[in-house]
Amino acid sequence: MKDLDRRNFLKLGLLSTAAALSTNSVNAAGSGKDSSGGIGNVPLQKYVAKKYTNLLGGALTGFSDEQLKAHFALYEGYITKINDLEARIKNFDTNNPDTINYRGWHLEQTSMLNGAVLHELYFGNLGAANKEPKGSLKKMINRDFGSLQSFIGHMKTVGKIFHGWSLAALNYRTGKINVYGLERHNLNVPTMVSPILVLDVYEHAYMIDYGTDRKKYLDAFVMNVDWKPVEERLEHALSIPFGEAVTV
């Protein structure tokens, strides 16, 4: 298949997937007044899609509005779907011996939840307003990878060889930053880590602008990283003690 034909084919598939995810939703996990249940914090009753219009209008070099809007629509579909799934799971009668659908909902729940949250982290670390890491982030990158160039090299290499995500995260067990590869939203997901930099390498993230040329997309991503939210995520993660005690 020619690259242009493949690009149009993938574009159509992305838009169709986003539309499918956005249909057949139910009102999410509760419609009454919020209640903390005596715990003190009031939980959200449903997921609400965040807006990333600040990334449009040429704010990102190498990312067209068409590409970004299609990507936003896909993310919004994940939000719709996770609300639907969590409502179905909550309302399931656990005395019902027919658990085939229940199992399917749980399998899909992790995929839709991770799909929603990882996209929020991905869009959140784009913007290019702050082009260099600073403070604790810079020090830890140099400590754990030797240099920013080496760190970026690991992010991009993982992005080349995995189908889903490349993400840097603070490992609570060791206190170090590691780069992890996710084959799917809910496959190869590490535990006891807090993501700080997230890179979407599914074809839907770049196919409109770059077709199958993932290398050019990876270069564009690096050029458009906003390091400020990455620093803020790390500082938040560091506020939680790490080490052997986390697995008590």
Language-model features: locations:
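N-terminal secretory signal peptides and thylakoid transit peptides that target proteins
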Residues: 1-17
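C-terminal segment of N-terminal export signals and the immediately downstream linker at the start
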Residues: 24-58
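All-alpha RGS (Regulator of G-protein Signaling) helical domain and cognate RGS-like helical scaffolds
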Residues: 40-47, 52, 62, 71-73, ...
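Alpha-helical scaffold segments that form or flank carboxylate-/histidine-based iron centers
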Residues: 60-77, 96-117, 140, 184-186, ...
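Non-transmembrane amphipathic alpha-helical segments
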Residues: 78, 82-85, 89, 119
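An amphipathic alpha-helical core segment
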Residues: 156-225
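N-terminal targeting pre-sequences for secretion and organelle import
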Residues: 216-248
